Amino acid sequence: METYKGIQFFSNKGTVKNAFKKSNLGYEVMLDRKEDENFIYSNYEHVETQVEKDSKGMVVCKKYKNTYEILVEKVKEKRLGVLLVGIGGNNATTMLGGICANAKDLSYMNKCDLKRSNYLGSVFLSSNIRLGYNEKDKEHAYAPIYKLIDIYNPENIVYGGWDINNMNLKDCLVRNKVFDNEVIEKIKDDLDYVPLKSVYFKGNFIAGNQQRRVNNILYGKNKLEILEQVREQIRNFKKQNNLNELIVLWSGNTEKNIPHIPGVNDTFLNILHACKKNHESVSPSVIYALAAILENSPFINSSPQNTLVSAVVQLAQQKGIFIIGNDLKTGQTKIKNFLLDFYFGTGLKPKSIVSYNHLGNNDGKNLSSDLQFYSKKVSKSNLICDYVRANENLYVDDEKDTNVLVKKSIDYCEGDSLNEKGKVSADIEDDCTYVESLEKQKVNSEIVIKYVPYVGDDKKAIDEYISEIFMNGKNTIVLYNICQDSMLASPILIDLILLVELSQRVFFKPNQEKKTNEDEHLLNENIQIEDYKLSHTILKPKYSSFKNLDSVLFLSSLFCKSPFNSTVYKTRHSFFSQLESLWNFVRIISGLPIDAHIDLPYMI
């Protein structure tokens, strides 16, 4: 029988406050805002440019304004839980081990020095945001985000989760080989936890080399029955741990990508029928996403696959539940992200970006399979495509054949030396088509990932960037990056959890309302799937005149390789735009004006 008691790092610390605080900072920030014991109140006027093309091809720019009343709930006594899919994996155990070490304020010796636990790499817990300018001292003033607004303490969250393998988490710490032995010895008893039974379907969703890990799975007649079992697990965990809110986070293996299939995964009704019929396209991650949303729990996809199909998005939007994806932006892609900002921002023209990396953890093992690697490759490549579309003027001349010495031969022999009249085979046609597609790329982009067991979690990455510079010169930058993959990923998982929790406490009242779709509230609390009635609850708005953020939480784009777009907005891929968007969001909800980076009063 499964146990639903979660992991609680705060149980040995006595009474603790849910809002994150750091005791070694000897100051507080006093903000010019209205607040009481329950809420922070602020107002914000948003000004943006709306762009349209008229019938003559003219780009018309119009200024648009809207004012918002903002209501932010304080954390207070809320109990939050997080269920991780793939809880025994490197990322999940590293995140939990790090939070545990911080909760215990752990110090330990590595081979170089005495070290203390920290949250380095977390935007919410370690980075500083600009407050304004101190004219007297002629200094810009900065403070951590948690000094401006309540950020939930990750050490106070109740954790649990699923895994296809039943190994206890304290043994997973040893198997995954991320932490030093001294750290493992000091935290392993706090991670004494056996994962819940998980969902596993054959059909190449994950690599075949993972089959030998499978010994801890749910069984059912069809995928709808298994979906209902996962929902029951979520309810039981929430009830036994006395939780007010719960977040489900996919930290499992990369799955293969699933195509958009009309009639199957285009609407929530169709995908529920597809579950009943055991349709081959319904993956384990889709089961968890549907289960989380039906249980009114936000869902985070930290892996590359396209779990957030149209059906999942529609269900989330009709229920008003946050969804986040896809794939964590950790080392190589994060560097690529801000390097592309540098290239395009300074008028340079990237032409070739080749990325190679090898690693030896279970992520690398799973990605050694072609189907799973393809999901990763697509996720890593989306970044470049959006930058090129935003800077098409740099590539106009590339569409012309500027090299007059090279001409493509139209008249060629389809046979060979033995058969002059032969026909070109399908394999040759495919090969030619593939090569021609590479030759047509505005930026040649290639990604290679190899599994090398010996290196373990220490991923080695090599990147070569070639760009065109002034008067057709060339510039080449080569980077060699060695990083502990899971230690880069773990603070990003923490940030995604904290962002979702914060977003659930923020409400907006716009002066001008958007038009809503007529079918926005067609969802019933009882859904008939053939002979089965699926029941769920629909949350009512907390405050009648205030609204939550859209279900597709694109503020998370800073943390995701392939950030998901909503039905009305396409996310910007610029690293600094994403970072400033998140920081400005924090500013306006805490009562500060946005930082426009112009400092005009000091220019005049």
UniProtKB/Swiss-Prot annotation:
Co-factor requirement: NAD(+)
Binding site for NAD(+): 88-91, 163, 198-199, 210, 213, 251-254, 303, 327-328, 330, 361-363, 376, 456-457, 485-486
Entry's Gene Ontology cellular component terms: cytoplasm
Pfam families: Inos-1-P_synth, NAD_binding_5
Database matches in Gene3D superfamilies: NAD(P)-binding Rossmann-like Domain
InterPro entries tied to this protein: Myo-inos-1-P_Synthase, Myo-inos-1-P_Synthase_GAPDH, NAD(P)-bd_dom_sf
Listed SUPFAM superfamilies: Glyceraldehyde-3-phosphate dehydrogenase-like, C-terminal domain, NAD(P)-binding Rossmann-fold domains
UniProt keyword terms in alphabetical order: Inositol biosynthesis, Isomerase, Lipid biosynthesis, Lipid metabolism, NAD, Phospholipid biosynthesis, Phospholipid metabolism
Highest taxon in the source lineage: Eukaryota
UniProt-recorded Gene Ontology molecular function terms: inositol-3-phosphate synthase activity
UniProt catalytic activity: D-glucose 6-phosphate = 1D-myo-inositol 3-phosphate
Entry's EC annotation: 5.5.1.4
Record pathway: Polyol metabolism; myo-inositol biosynthesis; myo-inositol from D-glucose 6-phosphate: step 1/2
Disulfide bond found in the keyword field: no
Enzyme class: isomerase
A GO BP entry: phospholipid biosynthetic process
PANTHER family tied to this protein: MYO-INOSITOL-1 PHOSPHATE SYNTHASE
Family per record: Belongs to the myo-inositol 1-phosphate synthase family.
Function: Key enzyme in myo-inositol biosynthesis pathway that catalyzes the conversion of glucose 6-phosphate to 1-myo-inositol 1-phosphate in a NAD-dependent manner. Rate-limiting enzyme in the synthesis of all inositol-containing compounds. De novo-synthesized myo-inositol is essential for incorporation into GPI (glycosylphosphatidylinositol) glycolipids during intra-erythrocytic development.
Protein name: Inositol-3-phosphate synthase 1
Gene behind this protein: INO1
